[in-house]
Amino acid sequence: MLLRLLLKKLKELRFTLLNILNNNILELKYFKLSEFDSPDEPGSGSKMDKKFLEKLDYARHNADVPFKINSGYRTKEWNAHIGGRVGSSHIKGLAADIHCNGSRDRALIIKSLLEVGITRIGIGRTFIHCDVDKKKDQDVFWLYN
């Protein structure tokens, strides 16, 4: 158990060191920033929190199943248009909604999110919401209708 934890921390450190060595240029293995764009603002995926994206990329690696991003960054206008919550973490670039194809993928995605320290997770029938908004309750799960 301790060895597994140490290996996990070493992998996290590797991602951080790569980011530093590359002059803080974010390099994602599994995502393009455009996947996180608000539909009404091309290029807005660049407003996503970089540390969150690194964690999400690492979670994708651990899960070994595709993470199709349904929603990443949202402008306030787009958030209102789709009926998003006022104060949504998507507006801050701290949240993503990941499509999931079934129970097995859902379990793998949630497990991998927890492994990288993403502990705010909402579970819907066809998607998983995850965020790292420190201004909200931590270590929480919720269900969507």
Region spans (language model):
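Extended, low-complexity, intrinsically disordered C-terminal regulatory tails
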Residues: 57-83
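Extracytoplasmic cell-surface/polysaccharide-interacting catalytic and binding patches
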Residues: 1-65, 134, 143-145
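Short connector loops at helix/strand junctions that flank enzyme active sites
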Residues: 62-64, 91-95
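Glycine-rich, flexible loop/turn motifs
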Residues: 27, 78, 87
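The substrate-binding groove and active-site-proximal loops of carbohydrate-active enzymes
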Residues: 43-46, 95-99
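Catalytic cores and adjacent binding grooves of peptidoglycan-active enzymes
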Residues: 87, 91-92, 100-145
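A broad, low-specificity signal marking well-ordered, structured residues that form hydrophobic/aromatic
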Residues: 67, 96, 128
